[in-house]
Curated annotation (Swiss-Prot):
InterPro entries membership: aa-tRNA-synt_IIb, aa-tRNA-synth_II, aa-tRNA-synth_II/BPL/LPL, Anticodon-bd, Anticodon-bd_dom_sf, Pro-tRNA-ligase_IIa, Pro-tRNA-synth_IIa_bac-type, Pro-tRNA-Synthase_IIa_type1
E.C. number: 6.1.1.15
Gene: proS
Protein name: Proline--tRNA ligase
Superkingdom in the source lineage: Bacteria
Subcellular location: Cytoplasm
PANTHER family, per the entry: MITOCHONDRIAL RIBOSOME PROTEIN L39/PROLYL-TRNA LIGASE FAMILY MEMBER (PTHR42753), PROLINE--TRNA LIGASE (PTHR42753:SF2)
Chief location: cytoplasm
Gene Ontology molecular function terms on file: aminoacyl-tRNA deacylase activity; ATP binding; proline-tRNA ligase activity
Keyword Transferase assigned: no
Disulfide bridge positions per record: none
Length: 581
């Protein structure tokens, strides 16, 4: 490709709404152009990156035995109503009507459609296992799209779906896909971690995320440096402190704390560690009738250490809260505690509540909590003496660095990551909901055991940039660079020697199968170099009259601070050697 034929459009400054580095550089390098909130044009330079991502994904999916198909972007609502996701997904699922008033959705994933295919086409155990995948446009109506392609509304995703006759087969298919994902991300040349994850709205009971390590990542990744343990923050288990609960030493005392409504404020006032305070979080669950009207509500009190944060995913697994919960209203809090938020605690309640205690709080002694009296807290609170031993103890919090690893191999560490892939073992969640069966070896109908496997094709380039950039621009890994080599002839329009050498090297690289672009635009050297450093092509060959007279050209890798002089006769071999490194 010659630059004069290509579409190159770079910016000196990033748009004001571009918050993270990848968004800024993708806009400045002309990879994407914003069309609307969370919706982007993939410009020619950016599309080349996306196509290279797709090619690697496709190769490894095919190698793993998956078969490509394409499912519609617009899908009948009836299928989504069968599984209940039409209502459960909420506003993220874009719903539309056709001219006849029929309901449709714009696909965010395709579990329903692929399960419908399976129940029609896969009739016997002899046809199993099967794995269908697509690389297709998706849409999720994100409430706050941001960070460019990192969290857009329209995006390209590779989604695969496996169908097996039993759990053993399904889990084997899951492992095949997980290994394929490792090969994919290894080929991209990215630093990543595979972490245990919660299955969320997709469902299932076995799940891993593939997280590209980046300081700007939205997700917290928990891992143990001394072992292979890794999980996302939602999933990582917080173990109870080792050892027995200390004996009570302090008397129960109501202490004035005027204007101190947070644990941090109280700890500072009383000159005690924040870890000796306990925060009270008040939730409510509702029972509704057939019309959706609330019949009765139950108020719950959760106790966590003052220096810990509640993990909503874990809370949602507590029996009684697993059908859904909300934060209690101010009126409900006043009715049960006789006090406004900021001074709440488990003692001196106006009405009974259901109490759930975090593991750490269950082994605390002489702790501090609200007195259910404005401007007051209670110190020296102890289980068994001042309160009955808690009936419901659960892991309710996010882990913190230094916590014990659940595998017992050391302490936990935390870093940031960008989720670029996710694999799920679904079991029969969707096949049962849609009555998707096959005839088993015993001649009886059986539900498909399923798995689903996603890769964010358009998120991957953004994640790669977050991990590979400097003050001058992007530094693409070779595997997904828009072009692998750029030839920069200085004064090509004025020097026949420069032009001839540039054209000759260009032809040689093309013949060798190298993805090369020749910059024949006639730009000034500074502007030409700035463009390609911004765009991030990893290998650059500069040809100028002065170096040619010495029988040399200059080679520079995008990560190198300076260029290396290479003989004209050796440059082709030198580039090939660097590409193979």
């Amino acid at each position: 490709m010659k630059a004069s034929q290509f579409f190159i459009s770079t910016l000196k400054e990033a748009p004001a709404d571009a918050e993270v580095v990848s968004h800024q550089l993708m806009m400045r390098a002309g990879l994407i152009k914003k069309l609307g909130a969370g919706i982007y044009n993939y410009m020619p330079m950016g599309l080349r990156v996306i196509r290279k991502v797709e090619a690697i994904v496709r190769e490894e999916m095919n190698r793993a035995g998956a078969v490509e198909c394409t499912m519609p972007v617009v899908q009948p609502a009836e299928l989504w109503q069968e599984t209940g996701r039409f209502d459960k997904m909420g506003p993220e699922l874009l719903r539309i009507h056709d001219r006849h008033g029929r309901d449709f959705v714009i696909q965010p994933t395709s579990e329903e459609v692929v399960t419908d295919i399976a129940r029609q086409e896969l009739r016997s155990y002899k046809q199993l296992p099967k794995n269908l995948y697509q690389i297709q446009t998706k849409f999720r109506d994100e409430r706050r799209p941001r960070f460019g392609l990192m969290r857009g509304r329209e995006f390209i995703m590779k989604d695969a779906y496996s169908f097996d006759r039993d759990q053993a087969g399904a889990k084997a298919s899951y492992q095949v896909m997980a290994q394929a994902y490792r090969r994919i991300f290894d080929r991209f040349g990215l630093r990543y971690r595979a972490v245990a994850a919660d299955s969320g709205a997709i469902g299932g009971d076995l799940s891993e995320e593939f997280q590209v390590i980046a300081a700007t990542g939205e997700d917290a990744i928990v891992y143990c440096p001394a072992s292979d343990y890794a999980a996302n923050m939602e999933k990582a288990e917080a173990l109870a402190p080792a050892g027995a609960r200390p004996a009570a030493k302090q008397p129960l005392t109501v202490t004035p704390t005027p204007g101190k409504s947070t644990c941090a404020d109280v700890a500072e006032l009383l000159s005690v560690p924040l870890s000796t305070t306990v925060k009270s979080l008040v939730l409510a669950t509702d029972e509704t009738d057939a019309a959706g009207e609330i019949i009765r509500s139950q108020v719950w009190l959760l106790l966590l250490r003052g220096d810990h944060d509640m993990n909503e995913i874990k809370v949602a697994k507590v029996p009684g809260l697993d059908a859904g919960f909300r934060f209690a209203t101010v009126a409900e809090i006043a009715d049960h505690f006789g006090c406004k938020p900021g001074y709440l605690g488990p003692l001196n309640l106006q009405k009974p509540v259901k109490l759930v205690v975090d593991r750490d709080v269950a082994v605390m002694a002489d702790w501090i909590c609200g007195a259910n009296q404005e401007g007051h807290h209670i110190t020296g609170v102890n289980w068994g003496r001042d309160l009955p031993e808690p009936d419901m103890v659960a892991d309710l919090r996010n882990v913190v660095a230094g916590d014990l690893s659940p595998d017992g191999q050391g302490e936990l560490a935390i870093e940031r990551g960008i989720e670029v892939g996710h694999v799920f073992y679904l079991g029969t969640k969707y096949s049962k909901a849609m009555n998707a069966t096959f005839l088993g070896e015993d001649g009886k109908p059986a539900f498909f055991e399923m798995g689903c496997y996603g890769i964010g094709v358009t998120r991957l380039p953004a994640a790669a940039i977050e991990q590979n950039h400097d003050e001058r621009g992007i530094i693409w890994p070779d595997a997904i660079a828009p072009f692998t080599v750029v030839i920069c002839p200085v004064g090509m329009d004025r020097s026949e020697a420069v032009k001839a050498q540039a054209e000759s090297l260009y032809a040689d690289l093309l013949a060798a199968g190298v993805d090369v672009i020749l910059d024949d635009r006639g730009e000034r050297p500074g502007a030409m170099f700035a463009d390609w450093e911004l765009i991030g092509v990893p290998h650059r060959v500069t040809i100028g009259d002065k170096s040619l007279k010495e029988g040399q050209v200059e080679y520079q890798h995008r990560r190198d601070a300076s260029a290396t002089k290479v003989g004209v006769a050796d440059i082709l071999a030198h580039v090939k050697e660097r590409l193979a490194a």
